[in-house]
């Protein structure tokens, strides 16, 4: 394709539509979140012709509403998922090397308290294994701290039950910006991403195999067909709607964050601590606010009508 075409320039939208409907792509991706954007860049960088469609804004779903961390998988150690910790840590290191301007180390303070989920020995052992498996190096490696050192770093911690703690590294990002950066980079390799295009139904060849998607333009209500040799469903929570009964139903989960003013909760740095039910919770300063979360509960309502229970908010605040 002509690499001079900028598929993010809305003034040329009619040209984009004409281009993608006149082409048989190698890969068509449904979903413009971080997963779809990553697949788009990977496929395009390998020389494949790629189209990506998104029914709303790019990164409008989970990819703009996360905890803003590239999680290394520390919590998976207690489940003995060592291979997963190694994989997530290695991929995180690659992402940091490729995009250091947007994937940056974030020191996490891990308090150890009486009768808590963690003790000094298990914390030290877990973090050593974590650093090794996740390929953490240099100044980003963990450090065990005494009680006085912990309180010096974070005076808001309660003194009476505190035993000590540790500092380890996660990586923070701007999730929606990272998604957009991946999409923009994929354009450099010739990919054709376009948003406000909704996949309505699959199209089939005479032999009965899927060869494309009939789509609707949400800005004009016009219908169009996009043809492709391979179709990848990267629509996340909307997977069932795309497949329309062709596979087992997804069991969806919901996570929330409480966002408070830093004036009300003025912590010095990010915390990772026990909740009342022994789940681990993050508290992460971002500018003038602090994100507290996240929860993990079964989701049973319509995705366009999100409901947040007061009891779940109280759980995070406690």
Say what each PLM segment does.
Residues 32-33, 55:
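Glycine-rich Rossmann-fold phosphate-binding loop(s) that bind the pyrophosphate
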Residues 68-153:
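Dinucleotide-binding Rossmann-like beta1-alpha1 core, especially the glycine-rich loop
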Residues 45-64:
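Glycine-rich FAD pyrophosphate-binding loop
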Residues 30, 130-161, 165-181:
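Short linear elements at protein peripheries
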Residues 36:
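N-terminal Rossmann-fold NAD(P) dinucleotide-binding loop
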Residues 166-225, 229:
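Helical element adjacent to the flavin cofactor pocket in flavoenzyme catalytic cores
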Residues 42, 53, 101-105, 225-229, ...:
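Active-site substrate-recognition segment that forms the wall
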Residues 1-27, 42-46:
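Extreme N-terminal leader/targeting segments of oxidoreductases
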């Amino acid at each position: 394709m002509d690499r001079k075409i900028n598929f993010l320039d809305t003034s040329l939208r009619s040209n984009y539509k004409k281009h993608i409907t006149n082409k048989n792509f190698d890969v068509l991706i449904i979903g413009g979140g971080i997963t779809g954007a990553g697949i788009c860049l990977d496929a395009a960088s390998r020389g494949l012709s790629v189209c990506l469609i998104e029914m709303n804004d790019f990164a409008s779903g989970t990819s703009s509403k996360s905890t803003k961390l590239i999680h290394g998988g520390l919590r998976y150690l207690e489940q003995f998922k060592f291979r997963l910790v190694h994989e997530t840590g290695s991929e995180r290191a690659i992402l940091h090397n490729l995009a250091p301007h947007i994937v940056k180390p974030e020191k996490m303070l891990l308090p150890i308290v009486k009768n808590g989920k963690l003790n000094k020995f298990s914390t030290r052992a877990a973090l050593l294994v974590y650093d090794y498996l996740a390929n953490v190096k240099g100044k980003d490696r963990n450090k065990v701290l005494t009680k006085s050192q912990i309180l010096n770093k974070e005076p808001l911690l309660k003194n009476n039950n505190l035993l000590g703690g540790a500092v380890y590294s996660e990586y923070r990002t701007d999730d929606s910006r990272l998604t957009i950066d991946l999409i923009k980079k994929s354009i450099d390799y010739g990919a054709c991403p376009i948003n406000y295009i909704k996949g309505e139904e699959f199209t089939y060849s005479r032999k009965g195999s899927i060869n494309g998607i009939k789509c609707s333009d949400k800005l004009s209500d016009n219908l169009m067909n996009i043809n492709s040799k391979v179709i990848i469903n990267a629509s996340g929570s909307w997977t069932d709607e795309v497949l329309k009964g062709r596979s087992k139903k997804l069991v969806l989960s919901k996570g929330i964050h409480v966002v408070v003013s830093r004036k009300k909760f003025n912590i010095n740095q990010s915390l990772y601590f026990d909740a009342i039910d022994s789940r681990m919770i993050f508290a992460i300063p971002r500018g003038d606010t602090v994100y507290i979360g996240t929860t993990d509960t079964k989701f049973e309502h319509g995705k366009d009508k999100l409901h947040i229970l007061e009891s779940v908010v109280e759980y995070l605040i406690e």
